Amino acid sequence: MYKKEVNRPFVVNPLTVSVNSTGKERLVLDLRHVNKFVEKQKVKFEGVKEAMTFVNFSGFGFKFDLKSGYHHIEIHPDHQKYLGFSWQYGDTVRYFTFSVLPFGLSSAGHIFTKTVRVLVKYWRSLGFPMVVYLDDGMGTAENFDTCFELSKTVKNDLLLSGFIANTEKECLGTSTKY
């Protein structure tokens, strides 16, 4: 997720921990000063409207969650110096930089969504009814066997694309009656 820096990075940002409603902790890089220089990009997330368009709720379905979704996207080495933070080890301060997309970068949602959308467009071109919101996705089919095969194809495509599914949440390779 990050790499050790020999020297102090160009920018050293505060590092915080965010806790969600289930108690899961997530490292968040406070990039408020860096974000001032990041071009603002609009991103349209899929939601209920798209789910109603693409998904068949009268058949079988599966879902997936990508483990640490943003951390699948590598940051170009020239840009990592802006994603630095420090860590105190006893009497020594050590510096690190994120080498993957961090939580806290204002363009992270746009970058991640645009990357995953390539897979979604591919699946839809094959006739797979899919909806993805950031790192969570679902698909459906009219019968169990088709849904099971679809979920295996999606799981394989995710792995071949370098994504890792969260095995604690995934239902890939399974089908559930809606």
Q: Which residue stretches match the model-derived regions?
A:
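Catalytic-core region of right-hand nucleic acid polymerases
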Residues: 1-113
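A conserved non-catalytic segment of reverse transcriptases
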Residues: 94-99, 155-178
